[in-house]
Amino acid sequence: MHLSIDKLSKAYGFLWALRDVRLDFQPGQLAALLGPNGAGKTTLLRLLAGLIVPTLGSICFDGAEFAPGNSGLRRKIGFLSPADHLYENLTVGENLRFFASLYRRPHDAAIEENLAAVQLAARQSEYVANLSSGLKCRLSIAKWRLLQPELLLLDEPYGVLDGSGVDLLEDFLLAQCARGGIVVIASHHVARVLRLCNRAVILHQGRVTFDETKRQPWPSFDQAFGEFLPHGDP
């Protein structure tokens, strides 16, 4: 999948959350989306997920303009966030079976495999409502592992994960990119995502102020980051 964003803008009344964003993403890119609170990161992710519509501009996948009503394209997009939709009145296993049917993915063995990968195989019969926030996040990882979206968007995924959960998440993201997917992750854990990602995009006041792929002779993304984010931001 090739993702192209052209002149993308989003206004809420008189407030512009995004202004004239132009970005292109190639298969295999794992991009960090960085910036201070209110920079427009979540707005951009929600636009890419088809959850809101742009005021101006376009989003194209492989040359085809994306509209929220395009269910075929929607099935190629995953959005992992603290508000990732899970059915709390269903069990862990029932959730994965439901989403597998919705996205037309294989059941049974694949579900077992993905629950085992996030260490939830023994909890398949537990109701999601009874899980901790960290375990719900692991279930979301299993869900998107199963569904294999071509574009995976993540909004602050680290908050409720313990150390082993973080490792599971990052292994999954690297595997997604290795198979040709695109991953865009918004996070305030700057040093962590810059070590993980091969591209960094910084938003400030709704505009792209920095966009570079990881390359030498940069010793690390950490040093580059401080030059482009306004002083005092995380």
Question: PLM ranges: what are they?
Answer:
Residues 49:
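Helix-to-loop junction immediately C-terminal to a conserved catalytic motif
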Residues 57-68, 73, 210:
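Conserved ABC transporter NBD signature motif
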Residues 187-188:
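H-loop/switch region of ABC-family ATPase nucleotide-binding domains
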Residues 97, 108-123:
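Conserved ABC ATPase "signature" region
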Residues 34-36:
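The feature captures the beta-strand-to-loop junction immediately N-terminal to the Walker
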Residues 152-155:
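Catalytic Walker B motif of ABC-type/P-loop ATPase nucleotide-binding domains
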